[in-house]
Amino acid sequence: MKTIMAKPGQVERKWYVVDAAGKPLGRLSAGIARILMGKHKPIWTPGVDCGDFVIVINAEKVALSGSKELKKVYYDHSGYLGGQRVTPAWQLRQKKPEQLIYRSVKGMLPKNSLGRRQITHLKVYAGPEHPHQAQQPEKIELP
């Protein structure tokens, strides 16, 4: 019996919609990363982008457990001396709620060119509306 190795032209991509309202950030992000990588498919191949597209709605209502809302911080750096910026999670939720999910999922993807391509298949929206109705996305439930 031969092992099936998928080629980039053989991969069929689907679109999924995930509602983030009230879901824990880490569990939600792990499920989304799994779909983006394509690990839920039997033809998953390590070096090939086998993943599907994921649309996340209600990103502003994602749950952070415990005191993470106040204590969790996100670091950025401008590249200049003294250019480090620290943003707490509560402030990031007010300004750019999509970034909470985006950063969490990006950290769970491979740190190479394949991961950079896979993160482009993630579409995150703060509210319940999204402009991707033409793709006929399928609604799925993640823990």
Curated annotation (Swiss-Prot):
A Gene Ontology cellular-component term: cytosolic large ribosomal subunit
Family matches, as InterPro entries: Ribosomal_uL13, Ribosomal_uL13_bac-type, Ribosomal_uL13_CS, Ribosomal_uL13_sf
PROSITE patterns: RIBOSOMAL_L13 (PS00783)
UniProt keyword Ribonucleoprotein present: yes
Cystine crosslinks: none
Keyword line: Ribonucleoprotein, Ribosomal protein
TM regions (residue ranges): none
Pfam families found in the cross-reference section: Ribosomal_L13
One MF term in the entry's GO annotations: structural constituent of ribosome
Superkingdom as given in the UniProt entry: Bacteria
GO biological process, one term: translation
NCBIfam families, per the entry: rplM_bact
Entry similarity comment: Belongs to the universal ribosomal protein uL13 family.
Function summary: This protein is one of the early assembly proteins of the 50S ribosomal subunit, although it is not seen to bind rRNA by itself. It is important during the early stages of 50S assembly.
Complex formation: Part of the 50S ribosomal subunit.
Protein name: Large ribosomal subunit protein uL13
Organism: Coprothermobacter proteolyticus (strain ATCC 35245 / DSM 5265 / OCM 4 / BT)
Gene: rplM
